[in-house]
Design a protein with these regions (language model features):
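Residue-level "contact hotspot" at macromolecular interaction interfaces
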Residues: 44-47, 59, 96
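Short, solvent-exposed secondary-structure boundary/capping segments
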Residues: 75-82, 92
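Short, charged beta-turn/beta-strand-edge "cap" motif at the junction between a beta-strand
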Residues: 57-64, 84
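Short beta-strand-centered aromatic/proline hotspots
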Residues: 63-71
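Intrinsically disordered, Lys/Arg-rich N-terminal extensions and targeting peptides
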Residues: 1-49, 122-128
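Short, conserved beta-turn/loop elements at beta-strand boundaries and strand-helix junctions
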Residues: 71-77, 107-109
Length: 128
């Protein structure tokens, strides 16, 4: 079976992301871990989850840390407590941030996530 060749043109790359099924967007919601977390867990990246503490690395809210309030799978965006703006009527509105522009600082660990981390570490150890 041959591997599907991805197009080189940026427009076709973006189209492929937008047209992909929503269940495959979870892979696109990965972001890198802080250096201390990388050493602790032996992983470079993990999928962002509600409740995680993240640091914004690029954009308008650069160098701000905040808790993840919501993860939007359809638009591949993350909403943070600290990334807000004031609307014309005075209400606070959250600004969406792309996962490639944030870094995980503290993880929201539950049993399911611990299992995922353990499975990934075992797989990387076996491949080496």
């Amino acid at each position: 079976m041959t591997k599907k060749i991805s197009p080189k043109s940026p427009g076709k790359q973006r189209k492929r992301i937008y047209k992909s099924p929503i269940h495959s967007h979870k892979k696109m919601l990965k972001c890198r871990l802080d250096e201390f977390l990388q050493e602790e867990y032996g992983l470079r990246s993990l999928v962002v989850k509600k409740g995680d503490l993240v640091r914004v690395m690029r954009g308008q809210f650069r160098d701000t840390e905040g808790k993840v309030v919501r993860v939007d799978y359809s638009t591949i965006r993350v909403y943070l407590e600290s990334a807000t703006t004031t609307k014309a009527d005075g209400k606070e509105a959250q600004i969406p941030v792309h996962p490639s522009n944030i870094m995980l600082v503290k993880l929201e660990l539950d049993d399911d996530r611990k299992r995922i981390i353990d499975n990934k570490v075992v797989k990387t150890a076996e491949s080496e």
